[in-house]
Regions:
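C-terminal boundary of histidine-terminating zinc-finger modules
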Residues: 110-121
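C-terminal alpha-helix
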Residues: 126-138
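Conserved catalytic-core segment of NTP-binding enzymes
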Residues: 2-97, 106
Length: 138
């Protein structure tokens, strides 16, 4: 897998690798050189602590990560103060706060792809903004 990802990186300008939740893909070093590591978390203290562990593991095993960004997903309302304080203590840029979106839940429940989200969807708009931000920074 590592060789395939390296070869794709030599061929294409952008390679997106979507992994399951957790740290196994980092500890296995499936990627060696990462322009942007997006660490996706739910808006909980436990999720933020896990994001911090993932970030630290990438440094410990010397994966060459150029930039790291935290993305909060399924956020309802304002972030509680303790959560915001935990985020502020991280050595991670908060790249995006994707709002909870009933349309995402509906599509998921029906087994339909998220590509069917319309451009007026709050989560669609936020992800679009995030993509623009990433493309400017890498």
């Amino acid at each position: 897998l590592r060789t395939i990802i390296d070869n794709l990186g030599d061929t294409y300008k952008y390679v997106v690798v979507d992994n399951e939740a957790g740290m196994e893909h980092i500890s296995r070093r499936t990627t060696r050189d990462v322009d942007m590591l997006l660490i996706i978390s739910d808006p909980t203290i436990r999720g933020i602590k896990t994001a911090e562990s993932i970030s630290e593991l990438a440094e410990e095993i010397e994966v060459n990560v150029h930039q790291k960004m935290l993305v909060l997903n399924r956020v309802t309302g304002e972030l509680p103060e303790p959560l915001q304080e935990a985020i502020d203590k991280l050595d991670l840029q908060l790249g995006s706060v994707i709002p909870a979106d009933p349309k995402v839940n509906e599509l998921d429940a029906l087994g339909k792809p998220l590509t069917q989200l319309t451009s007026d969807s709050p989560s669609f708009r936020e992800v679009e903004t995030l993509i623009d931000k990433i493309l400017r920074e890498i």
